[in-house]
Amino acid sequence: MSASPEFYRPSPPAFSPSCAAGTSTTEVDEYSCCRTPTPGIREPATCPPAPRKPRPVACRKLLFDPAQQQGKGKAISLRLDELERLFRPITNNANLHLQTNKPTHT
């Protein structure tokens, strides 16, 4: 069931401002018809700066100055024998035991 040729009418041409401007005698701004609007400045005046890594936190070593530490803490003085009692040094017998357990390279 097709339409008979006598009832067929072609569709009218699509309206275009440029076509209308060509047939009109008035001057139409050529930038306003069928164009995507663009900003006046096309390129940035200056480039943005490159991204930078954040700076690492500065390490601050606490320096011990007895003159500044008055009232903040106490300095402890120990004799060598007291220090050895707190932190026992490795004796020669322990060193020999460690050396005998090491595998030998042959």
UniProtKB/Swiss-Prot annotation:
An example molecular function term from Gene Ontology annotations: cyclin-dependent protein serine/threonine kinase inhibitor activity
Domain of life of the organism encoding this protein: Eukaryota
GO BP field: negative regulation of protein serine/threonine kinase activity
Alphabetized UniProt keyword annotations: Cell cycle, Nucleus, Protein kinase inhibitor, Stress response
Induction details: By cold, drought, propionic acid, chitin oligosaccharide elicitor and flagellin of P.avenae.
Keyword Nucleus belongs to the record: yes
Main location, first listed in the record: nucleus
Signal peptide: none
Region Disordered, annotated ranges: 1-22
CC annotations in GO: nucleus
Location within or outside the cell: Nucleus
Function: Probable cyclin-dependent protein kinase (CDK) inhibitor that functions as a repressor of mitosis in the endoreduplication cell cycle. May coordinate biotic and abiotic stress perception and cell cycle progression. Inhibits CDKs activity in vitro.
Subunit structure: Interacts with CDKA-1 and CYCD5-3.
Protein name: Cyclin-dependent protein kinase inhibitor EL2
Organism this protein belongs to: Oryza sativa subsp. japonica (Rice)
